[in-house]
Amino acid sequence: GYSPDEMEALFCSAEFENMLTGKLDDKYYYFFKKQETNSAWVQLKFDLDSAVFSPYLSLNIVTPYQMDFTFLELFSKSDYISKNNFDSLFIPFRCVATDVTHGKELVLDSGSLKDAIRASMTFPIYFNPIRINGNLMYDGGIFNNFPSDVLCRDFDVDYIIGVSVAKPQEEPTEDNLITTLTNMIVEKEQDKLFCKEGI
């Protein structure tokens, strides 16, 4: 239950900027063994003994460590109080993720709040997927980018106000991997309300 002012302060903070850029706050460095800097997206590994060629393509542009630590700090208290039941939060909560393992939409209503929120905003290529209950999860917008159906089904709502913050998708081009993948995997924007009352 963060107030609008608290949320605005978080979104305007250096910590939030670090989440989006992957820059790790100095206070977290002792959690990791420092590795040699490598900005490559693609690595080619050769095993000379067996002459095996195994290409490796990185699944993320931005490292998620800062986001994971920040979410741990922000949501651990709520996890503890709610006993991992999102209906027991001050405001009951749902979020939608994409279960990559089974190729389907998954509505998260329990478990780790930080993991659920992380999954629901993990866009392919930008962040690497998160594993929940053994399955890889990405942003739920791949299957359902306006989940009013979930809200109508799980909650007794009187009225829904839905806001689309999506921008029109760029046309895919031959030399832009991001726009090509975005057009392939993200469901076209839809704003259908499944309840009787709403805008």
Where are these regions (language model features)?
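Patatin-like phospholipase
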Residues: Y2-I199
